[in-house]
Amino acid sequence: KRIKNIDTQGIFVPGFSGISAPYWKPGFDDVYVELGSDPNQIIRAGMESIGFLFNDILNCFKSNGMKIPKTLTAAGGAGRPVLLQFISSLIDLEICYFDRKDRTAIGVYRILSGNHFKDESENRNRKSFKPKLLTYKNRKIAKWTETLINLNIKDNYSEM
């Protein structure tokens, strides 16, 4: 709720415990690009960094020939509407959120296997996040990528 209506031009790269997939870089200092001292903008940029990493992981899948389903599922800790809407808009895919505690394994199974079996119980208590136009999307992805390249986290010639 706190950052629902907050916009930021800045980028935050969380480094305290390192950066995870697809880069696997061990700990480094957090990086703030074009972020001032407004805590809400820093929180928003931190949330967006999760979306950018998710986008980079999907791009790895695509560059390795994996087909991404039209709808992704999320649950558990990912159940933050602002985050799920941002990711949906960033990757141009619908994301369905189920209120069951942990559906991570089923989501991974569906992505990797392409098996989209239907379980009618899944349709209960489901929220759907459809992509919305992000006017700044390409600019922010480019800034994220440039920041990772400047930090020697991402290869300049990588297809991700």
Residue ranges and their predicted role:
Residues 1-160:
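Glycine/Thr-rich phosphate-binding loops that ligate phosphate moieties of nucleotide
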